[in-house]
Amino acid sequence: MTKKILILSGGISKERLISLDTGKQVAKELIKNGYKVLISEPDKNLSKNITSFKPDVIFNALHGQFGEDGYIQAILETKKIPYTHSGVIASSIAMDKEISKKIFIKNKILTPKYIKFNHKKNKLNIIKLIEKNLKFPVVVKPINEGSSVHVYICDKTNILKNLKVLKSYNEILIEEFIPGREIQVAIMNNKSLGAIELEPRRKFYDYEAKYNSSAKTKHLIPVDLSKNNLAKITGIARAAHKIIGCKGVTRSDFKFFNGKFYLLEINTQPGMTKLSLVPEIAKHKGISFIKLIEWILKDASINR
């Protein structure tokens, strides 16, 4: 019997276009391999689409707010249909950069030092606040956003300008900038799928570097690490995946500097576009795109 897959994509976040691309790529591969597919927005028609299509599994291809922060997962739980990726609690924790960093620190996982800045509450001179707790340069980013949306590397000369850009966000995370190598690790079924190193031409692996082929970010795989260091970084990624309570596939983002691995964040809904890293890591391991998708579907469940 042909399986019916409803793909959730689009949404209202700043990562809408990436989500649409992920949904399109997954749908194309599933249709090519004989699956019945319906792509749906997470809007007022979702319940009607679920009722009429009667999917066997819901593939969550949403990114960003409402898609990977626990909200849509809570709605999907009420539908009693197996869905992919992490559940309500893990999604909400991973999306909140401050909460996830607190959990990393509690579990002795190295992560850059940080402070939280609230536009309404913090009346102190921000430069003095940073100099007291951190050191320049710093990375400034929204606490609840993905795909490096509105992430800036700042020094004293541009910190105020970039904070002004972020004024629409109540809370901002300001963390020490860690130089060094950018390495990403994919975890699947609580096991390491592999690692990939990025050499962006830009200052760091930002939104443009991730999704614009003209940015010409170099993808290096296999990663040039000693056996011991590779085991170390994949072990940290596995630990973070487990501690947060993630399911399915995740991608952990690291900086490697002075022999230390710094975990920046864990992504519960890694992209599945042509430029996405998890499919590339899987391919290097001999896992085709359709096999990766089918594994994600097979792992789907309720009460995640």
Curated annotation (Swiss-Prot):
Cofactor note: Binds 2 magnesium or manganese ions per subunit.
GO MF annotation: an example: metal ion binding
Pfam families: Dala_Dala_lig_C (PF07478), Dala_Dala_lig_N (PF01820)
Entry superkingdom: Bacteria
UniProt family annotation: Belongs to the D-alanine--D-alanine ligase family.
Organism: Pelagibacter ubique (strain HTCC1062)
GO biological process: cell wall organization; peptidoglycan biosynthetic process; regulation of cell shape
Residues annotated for ATP binding in this entry: 131-184
ATP-grasp domain sequence ranges: 101-298
Name of this chain's protein: D-alanine--D-alanine ligase
UniProt keyword Manganese, yes or no: yes
Cofactor: Mg(2+); Mn(2+)
